[in-house]
């Protein structure tokens, strides 16, 4: 089916272009959401008549998205989740969790604007891509940790995936001779 795009759609085309798409994609996504019109003579004349209005609305949406992007770009958010000693989360951080975190900070982002290839399943610093508009794309950083203190340590660059790093155990302080003191047991070293 051929459609006329009413806005820029990534991997498909620019506003005003006539593109051929699969029928299901047009019927279930593009047409109901108002992102395209069927490519027939009546709709072509309708599009040309409304082109200036559509371009102005698109420019307004882009400027709003750019304002949000200027505030959000490069920002870091702390996500506290329970995890095992190896750093594996008990659960995951998915797109809906990112939306909730940003919503708590006062940003209105939709779940379809968060681009995560796979859910986050380990502690650490993770970059998340947000597509606020077809032409405005930014990255935010999620600091996934077990506690706020651990998040601060991760932000400073510490690797917290081993038990020693998590609990601050010093390898040099734990020598076998510290655990066994022959004089404390009443055994002489000469007798042993």
Curated annotation (Swiss-Prot):
Which Pfam families does this UniProt record tie to the protein? Ribosomal_L9_C, Ribosomal_L9_N
This chain belongs to which protein, by name? Large ribosomal subunit protein bL9
InterPro entries in the record: Ribosomal_bL9, Ribosomal_bL9/RNase_H1_N, Ribosomal_bL9_bac/chp, Ribosomal_bL9_C, Ribosomal_bL9_C_sf, Ribosomal_bL9_N, Ribosomal_bL9_N_sf
The record's gene field reads rplI
Keywords of this protein's UniProt record, alphabetized? Ribonucleoprotein, Ribosomal protein, RNA-binding, rRNA-binding
GO MF assignments:
rRNA binding; structural constituent of ribosome
Q: Which cysteines are joined by disulfide bonds?
A: none
The family database entries (HAMAP family) matched by this protein are listed as:
Ribosomal_bL9
Family (UniProt): Belongs to the bacterial ribosomal protein bL9 family.
Superkingdom of this protein's organism: Bacteria
NCBIfam families (alphabetical) = L9
Question: Which spans are transmembrane here?
Answer: none
PANTHER family per the UniProt record, alphabetical: 50S RIBOSOMAL PROTEIN L9
Q: Which GO terms describe its cellular component?
A: ribonucleoprotein complex; ribosome
Q: Where is this region: Disordered?
A: 173-192
- Give start-end positions of Acidic residues composition bias: 179-192
Q: Which GO terms describe its biological process?
A: translation
Which purpose does this protein serve, as stated in its record? Binds to the 23S rRNA.
């Amino acid at each position: 089916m051929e459609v006329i795009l009413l806005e820029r759609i990534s991997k498909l085309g620019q506003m005003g272009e006539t593109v051929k798409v699969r029928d299901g994609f047009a019927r279930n996504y593009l047409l109901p959401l108002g992102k395209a019109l069927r490519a027939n003579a009546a709709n072509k004349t309708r599009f040309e008549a409304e082109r200036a209005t559509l371009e102005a609305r698109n420019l307004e949406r882009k400027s709003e998205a750019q304002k949000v992007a200027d505030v959000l770009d490069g920002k870091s958010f702390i996500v506290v989740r329970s995890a095992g000693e190896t750093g594996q989360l008990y659960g995951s951080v998915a797109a809906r969790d990112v939306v909730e975190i940003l919503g708590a900070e006062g940003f209105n982002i939709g779940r379809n604007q968060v681009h995560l290839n796979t859910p986050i399943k380990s502690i650490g610093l993770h970059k998340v891509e947000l597509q606020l508009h077809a032409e405005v794309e930014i990255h935010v950083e999620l600091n996934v940790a077990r506690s706020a203190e651990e998040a601060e340590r991760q932000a400073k660059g510490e690797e917290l995936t081993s038990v020693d790093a998590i609990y601050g155990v010093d390898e040099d302080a734990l020598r076998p001779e510290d655990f066994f003191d022959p004089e404390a047991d009443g055994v002489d070293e000469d007798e042993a």
